[in-house]
Amino acid sequence: MYSILVNALGMISFTLVTTAALHANAQPSSQGGSRPPLIIAPTVEGMLLCDEAVAQKNVRSMEDAYSYCRQRKLDGSGRVARLLDRLEPGGPKGTVQVGYTATLQLLALYRATPKGWEIDPARVDEFLGVIRKVQRPVVIYFSADHFDSIGPITEELRKDPRNLMQLRDGKPLELGYFGYRIMPYTLSTDPALAVNKYRQDALNYVAKRIKTLPQAVQSRIVAYTLAGELHHLFPDFENGMGAYQDIQVTDYSPASVAAFRKWLSAKYQTIEQFNTRTGLVYASFDEVPAPSKNIRKEKLAAFGEHYDAFADGTLPIAGWLWDPNKTIQQLDLFVNGKLIGEVPRGLNRLDVYRAEASITSPNTGFRFDLDYSAMPAGKHRAQVVATSNGSRHQLAEVDFVVVPRDQGRVASARAAEVPSLKNAKALPGVRSWLDMPKQLQDVYYNPLARDWNLYRESQVHAFLGEFHQWALKAGLPAQKLYSHQIVPNVNSSWNPQLFAAGQTLQGSAPWKQGLNMYGGATNSPWLRDFMARNKITEYGVPEFNPQQWKLQGTHLAAMRSHYDAGAHFISPYYFSIVHDRFKGAAEHGVNRMELRPDNPKDGSDSFYKAIIEYAKN
């Protein structure tokens, strides 16, 4: 989610190396066998900023600096090369090699002409010029998601509502991310839409230009990451990823709702089967709504309209657990005294890590998404039970209420529970908290809401699939095509329904997986298990930052874990070659992560040093 900083200030890039050089140095991994070198390909802010502009004291802004460089056909290749040589002196070699990630915003390539919007060849020239000159491996990131929003064509695209996702009121989201405007571009794959035509044409043009590069340069391109973080959008994009109350989601545009009805028709075949399986009553699929109303606050024409964070039949039982002595061997969820299953733990809770000095790992989260869809109406009790040396202790308990569709009264009798549990607070060193659900949370299962969420996931998958097809048809090599995706579920306090990205994260996808990782996700047993369950083998990490500072060796351990797991590349976020006089003074969640030896925030200085150390391998 942090790729916007470099997008706002200029394209980014990483060093290049020939395929022969990469594979000549293949070495055994610690798990046995051999593998090609791991490419450490940091995001570099300011890739197009030339030394000559920096030397001109009268050049005061980044915009003026870039103009100065473009007018003289200069670029930042020298500055990029010097940065990477500091990280790995003497060029790329060994089992770990330093490169860089070059970001190209596709819609930003367009300029207005008397004939309409056309690609500016000079913008592509300057981008590829750096790639030609910097002799190190490079990951090229084709940015075409909601962060591709700074080009002059953006204003024209936003005037046509067909290009944008909409909230239920028919309006597109007005979003920002640390001062950077976000555009809620549609996930529709309709090639007639202007936004899709311009994105595909730009990708075709750049791919054609790449194929004219000398073979030695092309071979230094180790991966292409596609489109950026593709997912649905929601209000308060900076802070709202964990919203569960009064949620709003996309896409309720007329085209999206019409496609939802077609999706339902394909799934159920007939309206009679739909009515039978859902218990809802509609005369035709054309009458079926995209659910959008909260039954607690709004009048429904029919129950199928109900939508909230729990309407799809899942209730998260989630919180955090700090157990530094590894006293607890297992967490289990019991509902009404019956075992439901083991509670996944070790999920990312960077907020807890930041809030409490004595907690030295962000991987404290636990979460079980309880499917309550088949449970009877009434009050139920959930208990999170910890097993320690054969004894069971209650870590948390909470009551929730399943409400019938008619909102009729339910029995208030005390639900059954696991008796005679010890208190987990008595376990030495153990600290915990239950965040969700709130006590007596009321839930209303609407099967149409479950379908709506699945359909929204299919929209994200379909667009990424279409973008992947564009790349293949443009002639880019299939073995180098990676996604650039977020994994919301690794953060136990987030609401994955807001993103609806789950279907894109399967190992069966035609693209290779590129999974962004921040905080505890960078070295996460939960995420490794997730990848194993989803049969993800070949992968890369297009954005990577542990954001930790409390324990020595954290950053090295995280990078080594991905070497051992077979990652092709990881892209530390982020380095900057922008002169300080061009940077804003305000600190925010993104620029805290600038990797430099004098920036202790979020452990950025330690990560900087760890990259230098690891590149010696």
Predicted regions and their residues:
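Bacterial N-terminal signal peptides
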Residues: 8-20
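Catalytic domains of carbohydrate-active enzymes, especially glycoside hydrolases
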Residues: 32-43, 56-110, 122-141, 470-474, ...
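Substrate-binding cleft of secreted/luminal carbohydrate-active enzymes
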Residues: 43-46, 136-149, 222, 228-229, ...
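The substrate-binding groove and active-site-proximal loops of carbohydrate-active enzymes
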Residues: 62-76, 103-120, 179-202, 445-461, ...
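Aromatic-lined substrate-binding rim segments of carbohydrate-active enzymes
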Residues: 74-179, 190-212, 463-474
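Polysaccharide-binding and catalytic clefts of secreted carbohydrate-active enzymes
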Residues: 160-330, 334-342, 346, 377-379, ...
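Aromatic sugar-binding surface patches on proteins
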Residues: 348-370
